[in-house]
Amino acid sequence: MKTQHNDEMQWIHHIPQYYDTFLIVKPGFLKRSHIILEAFCNAGYKVVKQTQKELSYIEAEDLYIMHRDKDFFAELCTYMASGFSRGYILKSPYIGENYTINETNKLKNYFRKCYAQDDMRNVLHTSDNFINLRREVEIYFLGEADVLCQEDKFKEGYIAKAMNVDKH
């Protein structure tokens, strides 16, 4: 960020703030989760918490509620409830919700190109906004969304408060 002081432009350096993002490695792809996670960590993401879970059909419906009226909804829910998936809460080194989502999507799309079997069995799901993130985290980490997704209003989006993270 630049500030004006005595007609000189000076740079102010800030401690990086981390935005919470949520990643799901979908059923059938858990054997690749270490490769996927390593790529995210190499890009500066930090693992806050992870879990492996077999979703019920109802939980899958809650996860993809935004697609409720689409033709593929029932098939997607059946697929997501077909086996274990792994959920990761990550801290992103990027400032701002939109920038974080764009950077996360780049990695997601790379892995989809490498490993996807079809449009539905496409390896990864990532949260596309803070509201969905909180709902999705609650599905995987029941009762912990308020603790894990602490929010502050910052410019165009929400950024999670910087916190100590453990790398798993």
Indicate residue ranges for each PLM-predicted region:
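Non-catalytic terminal and connector segments of soluble metabolic enzymes
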Residues: M1-H168
